[in-house]
Amino acid sequence: MKEIPMRDFDFIVSPAKLLTPEIVQMVSSIHEHKGKQELFLEANVDELKTLLEVALIQSTGASNRIEGIFTSDKRLEELVSQKAEPRNLSEQEIAGYREVLSTIYEGYEYINPRPNIILQLHWDLYSYSQGAAGGSYKNSDNVIAETDAEGHQKARFIPVPAFQTDEAMEELCARFLEAWEADRIDKLVLIPMFILDFLCIHPFNDGNVPLRYQQQIAA
């Protein structure tokens, strides 16, 4: 059988190629506004609390809709605010997303992108869903496909095979943390690179997109 090559997770050379003048300007602008953030936080505590509640609801709704999971706006707000129990499979997945999002908001400073942490978050994501394989990597190969106007499907890209997923996730997390701790590359460049590599691995049968959103929030 032909050997399938592993992906190369490069957080040293590749970032330099991404630093176009436009990206450098955007990164600099983000850092500049972050420096002004503390004064705004101190002066607008109540307003920011309201904005956070709205953001939690909108993030939960948007991420789940991408996965084909829907409920009414009223039920969504009740589920995210923990004022209601899930009634069906869709609402169970929404409740799981809420739990992971709460974990990240409350402890993001202590959450590192390590395989065991990512597996735990995935388990929490499906903690309300009976029979779901939360906390385990995919057990079969998956293909990201697209359908044209005539209904024909073709592969958009082929993720890492199931048998290489564990090794790929270990390598991805190790290389990312090395670059993060070395602090030679701007973290605003490293984060989207990690997210893209994570999606290219597509390590789970389900739940890859919600976890991608939550990793962005944690970062």
Describe the role of every protein-language-model region:
Residues 1-219:
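FIC/Doc superfamily catalytic core
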